[in-house]
Amino acid sequence: MELTPREKDKLLIFTAALLAERRKARGLKLNYPEAVALITAAIMEGARDGRTVAELMHEGTTVLGREDVMDGVAEMIPEIQVEATFPDGTKLVTVHHPIV
């Protein structure tokens, strides 16, 4: 199977998000890479489902709360930018203060 670098990146994000989801389900607080991966994957999947950029900008702030992450992680992520594939092309989704 031949994958482009972009496809490999998407799979890596999905795998990290899956791991983060499992750890969160076990009651563990997420670290920086896990939190970023989980929020990023949610945005990418929302785009694939046909949601709008505005909807995803809002939904990106509801994926995780401060109680879901280790101390200091929320402050380390002032924004997340995701280049997501929508039905009408690729767009940049920026989520400001994703963990509140």
UniProtKB/Swiss-Prot annotation:
It catalyses: urea + 2 H2O + H(+) = hydrogencarbonate + 2 NH4(+). It is an enzyme of class 3 (hydrolase). Its EC number is 3.5.1.5. The keyword Cytoplasm applies. GO terms for biological process: urea catabolic process. HAMAP family: Urease_gamma. This is Urease subunit gamma. It comes from Cupriavidus necator (strain ATCC 17699 / DSM 428 / KCTC 22496 / NCIMB 10442 / H16 / Stanier 337) (Ralstonia eutropha). The gene is ureA.
